């Protein structure tokens, strides 16, 4: 919460409320003297939050890419406190096999964060062309075996469950059973086995929910609605997300975007933000021991200037 610089009397937005951990901390720090808004795409999560928070926060069942339009319905056109987005998939969603996010639990191929949406993982896995499948697995999962995986998926259609898909993907990865190929160091907190289906499941989930496109829209909307002095804090969990946030902050903090060889500045761009975190903040060793899912988390923060 240090990066968000929470102070009583200001307005704050938790753009990805989830289980409400961040929202609870903001509510505590503002001592009930601030206006709080909580966004989530999952209607079930929002209902639980309503039970926990009551009238302490306003709940919005919406994708954070529609930040401005959603807040305007409540007469809010500017944010003077800050906006927080934690892009990690909710533990509640991962742990519920019936939501279809986990490659370790039996469930339908769903993966929709908002279950009112029509596109599901089943549609992508069983209906998309092989070339399109390979492209998203490579683009969103950064999986170098994407072509082989897409070919096997198409050959084994129809695929009905998460475990069936995970098994097909695992068979495409050379020496997938050799855990040494899937070790990642977490410092003194110990290593962890990375399942060979991790990248493919990430890619399908991101395609279903349009995660990167939503993030780009959210960043633009946040910058336009923040008042000078307010802060934007984003926690990412993989390189694609972090790259987008890093580049967005870099461009917003630039005072000139003219070509390097331009003799004079003609763009007239002004520096819009001050980057608070020159390097991303990562989880401490204690945090890693308490929650291994935080191993890839990176926090970046910026303060609006104009």
What is the predicted role of each segment?
Residues 1-306:
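S-adenosyl-L-methionine-dependent methyltransferase catalytic core, i.e., the SAM/SAH-binding region
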